[in-house]
Amino acid sequence: MSRRTLMLLSVATVAVSASAFAFGGWASISIEDLPDHFIVGKATQLSFVVKQHGVTPLDDLSPTIEARAADGSGNVQATATRGRAKGQYLATFTIPRAGDWRVRVKSGFGPSDITLPPMPAVAANSVAPVLTDYEHGRRLFAAKGCVNCHVHGAVDSKPLVESGPNLTEKKFDAAYLALWLANPAIRPPTKANQVMPNQGLSPREIGALVAFVNNGKVAATK
């Protein structure tokens, strides 16, 4: 995939359309330090940031988290509290039994929610399943807010603003995509309000997202 294609992608990503403003806008949710799995009976704290239109941190919301067993056998709910940073919230919950669980984060800002792909909960004395870069990236695609503007067939989520291209069949130069995810400003937007936010991704998160988008090809990270 050429750099020109990546430039066009960056212009489209997280584009704030006039219709979005007309209907009161939307908010992105970005989960910080997503765990690889849950431990049964042990409290998990999720920290996340809510930003209007993916840009402006939103304080004084009342976000909630719901974790549902993938087999429908149970659910856990938690109310988030304010964190130290602007727009940051913390929610603590405990998964009661082993199995796959889906976590939904409700921002408290209209219908701006995200639902993560199923994540395993394991007993404290059990060996956790191996997490591949691809699967890690698939979860991050939702957790870091990529789903706000992009469709990907491997992630069951509808974009809040359909401004970005469908990434299901896309592949990009891995090294350049890694640089771009680390610093979206290397491709400044050509139009106002069409900004790819910098999510402060770690090298591991960048490598996982590259592996997911490119269907397994991992970029070298330093």
What annotation goes with each model-predicted range?
Residues A142-N148, G153, E205:
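Short pre-active-site segment immediately N-terminal to redox-active cysteine/selenocysteine motifs
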Residues V122-A142:
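Electrostatic cytochrome c docking/interface patches
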Residues A20-S28:
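Proline/serine/threonine-rich low-complexity linkers at boundaries of modular beta-sandwich domains
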Residues G83, Y89-R97:
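Residue-level recognition of secondary-structure-to-loop junctions
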Residues K42-T56, A91:
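Beta-strand-rich structural segments
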Residues S157-A219:
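Extracytoplasmic electron-transfer domains, predominantly the class I c-type cytochrome c fold
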Residues Q52-A78, V161:
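Short flexible loop/turn segments that cap and initiate beta-strands
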Residues A15-S19:
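N-terminal signal peptide c-region/cleavage motif recognized by signal peptidases
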